[in-house]
Amino acid sequence: MGRVSTEALPSGLLNWVAVWRRNFLAWKKVAPASLLGNLADPMIYIFGLGSGLGVMLGNVGGVSYSAFLAAGMVATSAMTASTFETIYATFARMRDHRTWEAMLYTKLTLGDIVLGEMAWAATKASLAGTAIGIVTATLAYSEWDSLIYVFPVIALTGLAFASLSMVVAALAPSYDYLVFYQSLVITPMLVLSGSVFPVEQLSPMLQRITHLLPLAHSIDLIRPAMLGHPVPDITLHLGALCLYIVLPFFVSIALLRRRLTQ
């Protein structure tokens, strides 16, 4: 990996807003369909698995399985919304539409563009996660005031997965390789991170792996708060999410700089 030059880093505190605004204006035209698409999978899990398995499993950790599952789906929806925005929409803007190339002819640096794309992906993640949170509160699976606490965590989750996905987008030569990331990383992470069943049901080896997954840290922050329980190890989980935001960001900058100059 090459050295990240200062020209590739963000050139100002707010230059990325131009990229965010451009994506927002384009998204407004398809906003209803986009929101419904982000809600579809989590709602299927909540009503499908929650209603079906909830009857058989009863309570999980002192709460109904539906409430347990719904809290996990808040984090999961943020992960999927951010990931899909970055590995597909951002990848298309970078490679097919050549939107990035046009932006680089302005005063924006590569860092400004990447930061703006990540912020936009986190915005979509926040919308998706908050929407699921509102549904869970409406169904009395969580308290309304818990949404105030979990919203920043949803945003951090969106940034973390946007940063990770940006590395994938920088490395992928075609859309086919993006599917590998979705199938081999995102889907297993959904299963292993405690979104649909407690991680205590996993083997000790898999539990150790779970502690390294960003989705697991997000769920460990969101679920207790939504269920009215104390949140243990807040600093650890927040630090892990911040690490997943910062390190992949600089890695993606270096990879994208090399890719775009070839």
From Swiss-Prot:
Domain ABC transmembrane type-2 residue range list: 33-259
GO cellular component term, pick one: ATP-binding cassette (ABC) transporter complex
Transmembrane intervals: 43-63, 67-87, 119-139, 148-168, 177-197, 236-256
Gene Ontology biological process: oligosaccharide transport
The organism's place on the tree of life at top rank: Bacteria
InterPro entries with a match to the protein in the record: ABC2_TM, ABC2_TM_bact-type, ABC_2_transport, ABC_transptNodJ, Nod_factor_ABC_transporter
Membrane topology of this protein: Multi-pass membrane protein
UniProt-recorded Gene Ontology molecular function terms: ABC-type transporter activity
Pfam families: ABC2_membrane
Alphabetical keyword list: Cell inner membrane, Cell membrane, Membrane, Nodulation, Transmembrane, Transmembrane helix, Transport
Keyword Transmembrane helix: yes
Protein's UniProt keywords contain Cell inner membrane: yes
Compartments in which it is found: Cell inner membrane
Family: Belongs to the ABC-2 integral membrane protein family. Lipooligosaccharide exporter (TC 3.A.1.102) subfamily.
Annotated function: Part of the ABC transporter complex NodIJ involved in the export of the nodulation factors (Nod factors), the bacterial signal molecules that induce symbiosis and subsequent nodulation induction. Nod factors are LCO (lipo-chitin oligosaccharide), a modified beta-1,4-linked N-acetylglucosamine oligosaccharide. This subunit encodes the transporter.
Quaternary structure and partners: The complex is composed of two ATP-binding proteins (NodI) and two transmembrane proteins (NodJ).
Protein's name in the database: Nodulation protein J
